[in-house]
Amino acid sequence: MKKTALYSWHEQAGAKIIDFGGYLMPVQYSGIIAEHKAVREAAGLFDVSHMGNFYVRGVRAGEFLQYLTTNDLSKVSDGEAQYNLMLYTDGGVVDDLIIYRIDAETYFLIVNASNAQKDYAWIQKHIGAFEGVSLEDRTDELSLVALQGPMSGAILRKVFPDEDCNTLASFRFRKVYYNGTELLIARTGYTGEQGVEICLPNEAALELWSVLMKAGEEYGIQPIGLGARDTLRLEMGYSLYGHEIDSTVNPLEARLKWVVKMEKGPFIGKEACRQVELNPRYAVAGFSLDGRALPRQHFRLYNSDRQEIGTVCSGTLSPTLQEPIGTCSILREYSRPGTHVMVEIRGTMHQGVIRALPFVQR
C-alpha cells in the first residue's frame, strides 16, 4: 500500500485512513458533514496526491493527444487546461482526465488514482504510431493538494503575496516559486467552489501544506478527506469513474456530450460515439428521495408501473440540502426533471423525483 508525502500529517491529525486506489488516504477528520460545510462556507485543504501524473512530450505530442482523447485539444493554449476523456474503440470510458498544456511539445496529465496503471498502459499502447512522442510517469515524485472554498483567495494572497493567483481564470494555470521550489497552480477543482489545485515535488509538500493550514486558520480552514470530496462533487453532479462513467458507459449517455467533439478529426472511439449519437438510450440524471433512506450504487429505479428503468450511480445525504440525493443511469424518456420515480432500498420502494443538475448552484 502506498502513502502520500502527507501521510504522517494525516495520521497525527487523527484522520480515519482507508485504502483508496492503492493508497492509504484520509476519508475524514472531524466528520464528513463538518468538512463539507467548511468547503462551502470557508475553505478546505485536500490531499489528492494519489492521482496519477504523466508527462507527454514531443513535437507530435499535441497531435497524439488529439487522437487519444475526445475533446478538442487544438483549442487549448499554453497555460490552459482542459477536461477530457479517453475512450475504448467501443466507446466505453478508459478514464476522465485533465490535460495541462505547458507548451506545444509538453503536456501534463492528471488521471484517476485507481486507473493510473491502466491509463499508462493504454497511452503507451498507442504512442508508438507518433514518432518522437514520449510518456513519463511522475506519480511517485509529485504531490497534489487542492485548496477550495470561498476563502481560498484570501489564503492564497497570504501565502503567495507576490503572485496574484486570484487573477487566474477557470482552467488556467501558471508556474510559481515558493522558497525556491517550482509549483504549478491551476484554477481547477472538484467541489464547485472557488479554488486551486497545486502540484509540487513530494519533498516540498509537507511544508506548503502546513503553511496553507496556518494561513487559513483565521478563515476557518479545515483538512478535508475523501468522504466530503465525494459529497461535494455529487452535489455538483460531477462524474466519478466507476460510478457515472466506466468502461461500459458511452459519454453521450452520461451528460458528457460537451466533452466529445465529433467535428474534430479522428479519435479513438469516435465511430462508436457516432452510433450512440444517432440513438442514445440512456442518460445520467440527478434525483432526490422523500424520507431519509439513502440511495446507493446499483440500487434499481422503477416507474409507476414498477417496471425497472435504471440504476443508481451515486447516492448520499446532501449536507447542503439535507435530503437524500443521487445520480442514476436511466432510460432517456424518464430523465426529464420533475419525473416521478421509485428507488428500491432493501426491499422497500421509496418515492423520488428526477432533479436538474447541479443540485447546488454555486
UniProtKB/Swiss-Prot annotation:
Q: What Gene3D superfamilies is this protein classified in? A: Aminomethyltransferase beta-barrel domains, Aminomethyltransferase fragment, Probable tRNA modification gtpase trme, domain 1
The catalytic activity, as recorded, is:
N(6)-[(R)-S(8)-aminomethyldihydrolipoyl]-L-lysyl-[protein] + (6S)-5,6,7,8-tetrahydrofolate = N(6)-[(R)-dihydrolipoyl]-L-lysyl-[protein] + (6R)-5,10-methylene-5,6,7,8-tetrahydrofolate + NH4(+)
Listed under GO biological process in this entry are: glycine decarboxylation via glycine cleavage system
Q: SUPFAM superfamilies this protein is in?
A: Aminomethyltransferase beta-barrel domain, Folate-binding domain
| Alphabetical keyword list | Aminotransferase, Transferase
One GO cellular component term, please give it: glycine cleavage complex
Question: Recorded E.C. number(s)?
Answer: 2.1.2.10
Assembly, per entry: The glycine cleavage system is composed of four proteins: P, T, L and H.
Q: Which family does it belong to?
A: Belongs to the GcvT family.
- Please state what the protein is called: Aminomethyltransferase
What gene name is given for the protein in this entry? Answer: gcvT
